């Protein structure tokens, strides 16, 4: 011993240390330290553990401050009984013990010990896993505890330490997996996700090798902060962890368990955890926005779609379409087909509140509409209103004039005002129109009634009422009811169908024709008291004219129900008037 060069620090350390053998497996370093402190202050005591099993090998090394104390320990403590075993205390500088010390890298206290033998980056993950697995549970727990404190107290220093020692970060992650603080799957994801994180490793850049080395350390940092993200994901993992997932490499080789603890004691990577986690989150977020955008793109204004659906393809005058179309459940109306203008357009001021939708301004002779004779006029055009109200307001066929009250009609149309406007726009003489329409069908009312009865029992009745009731505006038995409360209008209700809102539109055209015809026929049959033709009569006459003048193409575009009712009406009118 005396011949050994004392100038070499490593040798000096070995001279100050003693080898302790035959240690009971259940003994702890603290207990042994207490025993060896009897001869003098102990700098460090270290038990040696099997890296494969993590169990103690039954021997260790005790380092004193000077060689004299070490010699005293060998003299006084050799053979000391502890837990039923006689401790063997020998010189740590012996050839055999020297080799042991060298392989374990225990030449100095834990805090000062080097990393140990260097290994290739490819083998680093496995080495780290073995080193971590060899740590006894209590030591592993202590390691995590120290790391937590380090991160809490010195986040930046801890971060730097882990960045510069990726193997430590990886070991901490592995330890968390073994302790079931972090789920193995999550650990793998963290490692792989952060491969793009630059690693600031000093010395050998062994970090990367299978699962994103650089990222490994950083990732672990996240997890090192047990309190942080890692603690959140609790999963179970086998003790040895997944070396494959750990791709950070140890520059110096596997840190000894004690060394790791010491290293952990250093500043903690507080910010690391956040950074790693943030990155993972960011990656995920990236994908999030895209789907959303995609979802948004398809979004369209529902109203636009409705309007489009409503627009008739061949409507000559789309002017009123916008107004009507959107509400038309069928996506189209007579009006749209006939190219009529939006009823509301010519209505002028909005209907009074008590009035319903101006839809049934059916009079539809909008200024822009074709001349009264043009059946395409607004009248038919707006079946929707009727749909809304099965009773089809303005078309109250039962009352001679549309609704004697005109504007009071639930739709709020001022029949008279509308008619006046419509007539003016067309430049038609109200009376002339009435004369024409009524004359043409003066006799027709009764004939129509008979035919209509076959196709539309209700309509026939309504017509009959009109044809027979010469009193004109005076409400007949089925006359219009008080404003806003219309009983079922036979005409408005589909033929034979009880006020089905869906048929109302169809019948509206027909009903209107019938009504106007009847109204028109009344001029001839007006009783003395009714020498005047009311605006409603003109309105109805105009409606009939519009229906009659619908072209075959326009009729073909209508829904089957409307088309059928209009064809029947035209046929009946032609038969009754003898028109071609």
From Swiss-Prot:
Name a biological process GO annotation. mRNA 3'-end processing
Q: Which residues carry this modification: Omega-N-methylarginine?
A: 308, 471, 478
Q: What is the effect of changing residue 50 to A?
A: In hemizygous mice, it results in altered polyadenylation and 3'-end cleavage of pre-mRNAs critical for brain development
The gene it comes from is: Cstf2
Provide the function of this protein.
One of the multiple factors required for polyadenylation and 3'-end cleavage of mammalian pre-mRNAs. This subunit is directly involved in the binding to pre-mRNAs.
Q: Name one GO cellular component term.
A: cleavage body
Q: Where in the cell is it found?
A: Nucleus
Which Gene Ontology molecular function entries are recorded, alphabetically? RNA binding
Location of region: Disordered: 311-331, 347-414, 512-536
Instruction: Cite a single Pfam family from the UniProt record.
Output: CSTF2_hinge
Crosslinked residue numbers (Glycyl lysine isopeptide (Lys-Gly) (interchain with G-Cter in SUMO2)): 189
Compositional bias ranges of the Basic and acidic residues kind: 363-376, 405-414
- Positions annotated as sequence repeat: 413-417, 418-422, 423-427, 428-432, 433-437, 438-442, 443-447, 448-452, 453-457, 458-462, 463-467, 468-472
- According to the entry, every stretch annotated as the RRM domain falls at 16-94
Upregulation details from the record are: Up-regulated during the G to S phase transition.
Query: InterPro entries from the xrefs?
Result: CSTF2_hinge, CSTF_C, CSTF_C_sf, Nucleotide-bd_a/b_plait_sf, RBD_domain_sf, RRM_dom
Family annotation (SUPFAM superfamilies): RNA-binding domain, RBD (SSF54928)
List every stretch annotated Interaction with RPO2TC1: 517-580
Q: Does the keyword RNA-binding apply?
A: yes
- The chain's disulfide connectivity reads none
* 12 X 5 AA tandem repeats of M-E-A-R-[AG]: annotated span: 413-472
Q: Where is this region: Interactions with CSTF3 and SYMPK?
A: 108-248
What name does this protein carry? Cleavage stimulation factor subunit 2
Spans traversing the lipid bilayer: none
- What UniProt keywords apply to this chain's record, in alphabetical order? Isopeptide bond, Methylation, mRNA processing, Nucleus, Phosphoprotein, Repeat, RNA-binding, Ubl conjugation
């Amino acid at each position: 011993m005396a011949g050994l060069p004392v100038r070499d620090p490593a040798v000096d350390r070995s001279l100050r240390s003693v080898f302790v053998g035959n240690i009971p497996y259940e003994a702890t370093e603290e207990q042994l330290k207490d025993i060896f402190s009897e001869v003098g202050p102990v700098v460090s005591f270290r038990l040696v553990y099997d890296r494969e099993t993590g169990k103690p090998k039954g021997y260790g090394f005790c380092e004193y401050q000077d060689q004299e104390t070490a010699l005293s320990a060998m003299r006084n403590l050799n053979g000391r009984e502890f837990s039923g075993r006689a401790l063997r205390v020998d010189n740590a500088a012996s050839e055999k013990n020297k080799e042991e010390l060298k392989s374990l890298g225990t030449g100095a206290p834990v805090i000062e010990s080097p990393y140990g033998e260097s290994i290739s980056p490819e083998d680093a993950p496995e080495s780290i896993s073995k080193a971590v697995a060899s740590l006894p549970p209590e030591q592993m727990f202590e390691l995590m505890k120290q790391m937590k404190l380090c991160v809490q107290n010195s986040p930046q220093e801890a971060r730097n330490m882990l960045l510069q020692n990726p193997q430590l970060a990886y070991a901490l992650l592995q330890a968390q997996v073994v302790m079931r603080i972090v789920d193995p799957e999550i650990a793998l994801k963290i490692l792989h996700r952060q491969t793009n994180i630059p690693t600031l490793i000093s010395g050998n850049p062994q970090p990367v090798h299978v699962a994103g080395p650089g990222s490994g350390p950083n990732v672990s940092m996240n997890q090192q902060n047990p309190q942080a993200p890692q603690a959140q994901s609790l999963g179970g993992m086998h003790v040895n962890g997944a070396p494959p997932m750990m791709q950070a490499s140890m520059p110096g080789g596997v840190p000894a368990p004690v060394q790791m603890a010491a290293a952990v004691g250093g500043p903690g990577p507080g910010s690391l955890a956040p950074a790693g986690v943030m990155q993972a989150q960011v990656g995920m977020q990236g994908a999030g926005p895209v789907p959303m955008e995609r979802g948004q793109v398809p979004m369209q204004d529902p109203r636009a779609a409705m309007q489009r659906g409503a627009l008739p393809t061949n409507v000559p005058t789309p002017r009123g379409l916008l107004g009507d179309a959107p509400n038309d459940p069928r996506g189209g109306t007579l009006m749209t087909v006939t190219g009529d203008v939006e009823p509301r357009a010519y209505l002028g001021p909005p209907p009074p509140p008590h009035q319903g939708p101006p839809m049934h301004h059916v009079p539809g002779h909008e200024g822009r509409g074709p001349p009264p004779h043009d059946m395409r006029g607004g009248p038919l055009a707006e079946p929707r209103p009727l749909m809304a109200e099965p009773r089809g307001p303005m078309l109250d066929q039962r009352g001679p004039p549309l609704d004697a009250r005109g504007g009071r009609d639930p739709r709020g149309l001022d029949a008279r005002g509308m008619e006046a406007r419509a007539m003016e726009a067309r430049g038609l003489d109200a009376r002339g129109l009435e004369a024409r329409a009524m004359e043409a069908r003066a006799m027709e009312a009764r004939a129509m009634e008979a035919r209509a009865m076959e196709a539309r029992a209700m309509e026939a009745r309504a017509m009959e009422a009109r044809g027979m009731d010469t009193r004109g505006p005076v409400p007949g038995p089925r006359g219009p009811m008080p404003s806003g409360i219309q009983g079922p209008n036979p005409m408005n209700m589909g033929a034979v169908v009880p006020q089905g809102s869906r048929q109302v539109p169809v019948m509206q055209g027909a009903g209107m024709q019938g009504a106007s015809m009847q109204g028109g026929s009344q001029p001839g049959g007006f009783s003395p008291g009714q020498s005047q033709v009311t605006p409603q009569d003109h309105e109805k006459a105009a409606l009939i004219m519009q229906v009659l003048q619908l072209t075959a193409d326009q009729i073909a575009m209508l829904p089957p129900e409307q088309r059928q009712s209009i064809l029947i009406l035209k046929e009946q009118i032609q038969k009754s008037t003898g028109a071609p």
